[in-house]
């Protein structure tokens, strides 16, 4: 059970870091319905 909890925490942490870096940098790909 503990392994599952630690795995979930690890994945969630990596996901948050990934999204933080992704949204911090300006998107190079132009959005189809963007401004």
UniProtKB/Swiss-Prot annotation:
Listed GO CC annotations: chloroplast thylakoid membrane; photosystem II reaction center
Keywords from the named record: Chloroplast, Membrane, Photosynthesis, Photosystem II, Plastid, Thylakoid, Transmembrane, Transmembrane helix
GO biological processes: photosynthesis
Entry's localization field: Plastid, Chloroplast thylakoid membrane
Domain of life where this protein originates: Eukaryota
Membrane topology: Single-pass membrane protein
Transmembrane residue ranges: 3-23
Major localisation: plastid
Function: Found at the monomer-monomer interface of the photosystem II (PS II) dimer, plays a role in assembly and dimerization of PSII. PSII is a light-driven water plastoquinone oxidoreductase, using light energy to abstract electrons from H(2)O, generating a proton gradient subsequently used for ATP formation.
Oligomer and partners: PSII is composed of 1 copy each of membrane proteins PsbA, PsbB, PsbC, PsbD, PsbE, PsbF, PsbH, PsbI, PsbJ, PsbK, PsbL, PsbM, PsbT, PsbY, PsbZ, Psb30/Ycf12, at least 3 peripheral proteins of the oxygen-evolving complex and a large number of cofactors. It forms dimeric complexes.
Family to which the UniProt record says this protein belongs: Belongs to the PsbT family.
Full protein name: Photosystem II reaction center protein T
């Amino acid at each position: 059970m503990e392994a599952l909890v630690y795995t979930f925490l690890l994945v969630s942490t990596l996901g948050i870091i990934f999204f933080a870096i992704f949204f911090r940098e300006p998107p190079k790909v132009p959005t189809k319905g963007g401004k």
